[in-house]
Amino acid sequence: MNARITSSAALLLALTSSLAVATCESDAGAILLYPQTTPERPEIPSPHRLADGTEVVVALLKAGSWAVVPVTVENGPLNLPYGRRGTGKGRQLDVDANDFSTLARTGLHSEDELDRTETITGKPVAEITKVGRPEMASGAGFMAADEDIISVLKGDNRLVRRLGLTHREMARPLFHIWNLMLKEYELHRIGRDWDNVRHVEYNGKTIRFGEVHPTRGFQESIFNDEIQGAWQINFFRELDEREWAFLREKYAHLDEARMGELIRKLSHILTGEMEPYYVMRYGFYEGHTDYRVDPIAIAFIFGLKSLEEIEAAFPGQLHEVLTSRFTRSCLPDR
């Protein structure tokens, strides 16, 4: 591994210090971990860090029982058979310090560094942009036809900064969802599709799943890295009455179609397992494609920020910010 890639130990320390989950020194021996289940909901927060450092989420299973699922974000082996390559946690803690030293140090990009960037992982940014466009490396693409890799990195960095968060904080709940799926796959509870979990609780929010299934073959990365994709992951959360009322008041000028678009982009994510690695390592959420993991949607769905806090960061602009592409001439305000 490149010596300039952030060390796992250093990043793990940073993640541990910033993780907003409760820790109970006496809980490690009292909580039953999945695949063991309980008929009643365990009385712990979700997400939660046990005294031994294990990160867990609370899930309601299809059968009606409750599970405390270990979902620790960590580097791990690709030891689960999947096709010819295998799958597993891989390098979840890595950040590309070789290209983005400020990202590795602070969790956010320096725009000066981005302006000077000519290659990422040794690959020219023009080539990354070319293969990332629709109908190149993938049908949907990794960015829109008028976006480029630097404009997308800048645009999302501005969104995350305005939310008062970091890219590693954004990556963590995405990894928790992926690690939940890996646990299910390890237990042979995922086949052509997956419907064993009714919902996951997260910061007081209820995360539900739509269609989740493996795709045909593997999606290769647009960077020179080992990241690959083989799953379609679909999750969302429903707005509560207070949130509906808040948006109707703040965005009363939107017609029904645009309000529906705002709600959909705010509360629903369709993606794959490549994205948490991309967010952690590069601060890359994909451009405005079908598989984008928008930072605003992550913050809303997983309760990293309240709707009021999100609106305060983008007053009156949520529909525009969620739908506008990141071109060189059209980026969100800093």
PLM regions and their residue ranges:
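Bacterial N-terminal signal peptides that target proteins for export
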Residues: M1-A9
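Bacterial N-terminal signal peptides
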Residues: S8-S18
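Alpha-helical interaction/linker modules in multidomain eukaryotic proteins
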Residues: T23-R334
